[in-house]
């Protein structure tokens, strides 16, 4: 089912970690309805997810999945595995296929036995386990181009963060329904880390400084 609602979210696997990133713009037709929309959620100690599509449907899924993860931990004493979490959501979405949740989901998690895990789900419950990267939303075609060009399975977490940010930045420059900042999370064996705005700004400043340095070096070579 093709649902490309306004937003851009990306997920990728690198160096035994999962990186999730989203923009912050919520649109209502051609209106920018919210410039600080939350599209990245922590579900469990080792699982986070991104949302794209209908806000009400997406938030209902977040509440449901968070509650199910807590119940699983109460019953078993363990955190719900990422595959079990994604499969549960797939079954929930499929059971509502007559009146579907109009949303696209990316689930990223870390399994202490199997390592980094990444899944994408469509509104009818179709689930794919992604071995490299994925993207959703109206800006996803642009984000995919950047991810295809720059992805390396062996890249470090730092390199993966920069690639995810570059994919989002490119989408925000060309897609009118994406923009207004970036949300970022890294999931490792240590758990889910959701970055503060100040931390993201610091990363962006570092990327700008590095890019400016490269441009200056090229200019000097040409002048010679």
Swiss-Prot record:
One of its GO terms (molecular function) is threonine-type endopeptidase activity. It catalyses: Cleavage of peptide bonds with very broad specificity. InterPro entries: Ntn_hydrolases_N, Pept_T1A_Psome_bsu_arc, Pept_T1A_subB, Proteasome_bsu_CS, Proteasome_sua/b, Proteasome_suB-type. The keyword Cytoplasm applies. Its EC number is 3.4.25.1. Residues 1-6 form a propeptide. The formation of the proteasomal ATPase PAN-20S proteasome complex, via the docking of the C-termini of PAN into the intersubunit pockets in the alpha-rings, triggers opening of the gate for substrate entry. Interconversion between the open-gate and close-gate conformations leads to a dynamic regulation of the 20S proteasome proteolysis activity. The active site is at residue 7. SUPFAM superfamilies: N-terminal nucleophile aminohydrolases (Ntn hydrolases). GO terms for biological process: proteasomal protein catabolic process. It is found in: Cytoplasm. GO terms for cellular component: cytoplasm; proteasome core complex, beta-subunit complex. The keyword Cytoplasm applies. Keywords: Autocatalytic cleavage, Cytoplasm, Hydrolase, Protease, Proteasome, Threonine protease, Zymogen. Belongs to the peptidase T1B family. PANTHER family: ATP-DEPENDENT PROTEASE SUBUNIT HSLV, METALLOPROTEASE TLDD. Component of the proteasome core, a large protease complex with broad specificity involved in protein degradation. The 20S proteasome core is composed of 14 alpha and 14 beta subunits that assemble into four stacked heptameric rings, resulting in a barrel-shaped structure. The two inner rings, each composed of seven catalytic beta subunits, are sandwiched by two outer rings, each composed of seven alpha subunits. The catalytic chamber with the active sites is on the inside of the barrel. Has a gated structure, the ends of the cylinder being occluded by the N-termini of the alpha-subunits. Is capped at one or both ends by the proteasome regulatory ATPase, PAN. This is Proteasome subunit beta.
């Amino acid at each position: 089912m093709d649902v490309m609602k306004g937003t851009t979210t990306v997920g990728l696997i690198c160096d035994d970690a999962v990186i999730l990133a989203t923009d912050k713009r919520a649109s209502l037709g051609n209106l920018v309805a919210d410039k600080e929309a939350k599209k990245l959620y922590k579900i469990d100690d080792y699982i986070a997810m991104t949302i794209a599509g209908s806000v009400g449907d997406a938030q209902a899924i977040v509440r449901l999945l968070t509650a199910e993860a807590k119940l699983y931990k109460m019953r078993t004493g363990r955190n719900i595995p990422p595959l079990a979490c994604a499969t549960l959501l797939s079954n929930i979405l499929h059971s509502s296929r007559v009146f579907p949740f109009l949303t696209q989901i990316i689930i990223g998690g870390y399994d202490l036995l199997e390592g980094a895990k990444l899944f994408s789900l469509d509104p009818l419950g179709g689930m794919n386990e992604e071995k490299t990267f994925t993207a959703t939303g109206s800006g996803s075609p642009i984000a995919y181009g950047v991810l295809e060009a720059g992805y390396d399975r062996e890249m470090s977490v730092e390199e993966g963060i920069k690639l995810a940010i570059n994919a989002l930045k490119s989408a925000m420059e060309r897609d009118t329904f994406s923009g207004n900042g970036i949300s970022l999370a890294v999931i490792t064996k240590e758990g889910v880390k959701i970055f503060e705005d100040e931390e993201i700004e610091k990363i962006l400043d570092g990327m700008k400084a590095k890019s400016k340095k490269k441009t200056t070096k090229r200019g000097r070579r040409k002048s010679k």
